[in-house]
Amino acid sequence: MGNNRFMVVSEERGIIAMNPSYIEQKGKNLIIYMPGTYKQLELEYKTEEEARSVFDDIRKAYESGKIDVYI
């Protein structure tokens, strides 16, 4: 996802991911890959549509240069 300053936060799950290297959607789950490691965070949503909506929010935030995305 580039070198922009970017953060993904899930207050419900206590997750913070600085500059995620890659994010993908698999069904009802979002997979957030951490930079410089083989670690990943998996967030599960109630529906695929909800997961898609959050994925789109993250993509739009990244493209617009926003700093934080709250999940």
Protein language model features and the residues they cover:
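Eukaryotic intrinsically disordered, low-complexity regulatory linkers and tails enriched in Ser/Thr/Pro
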Residues: 1-71
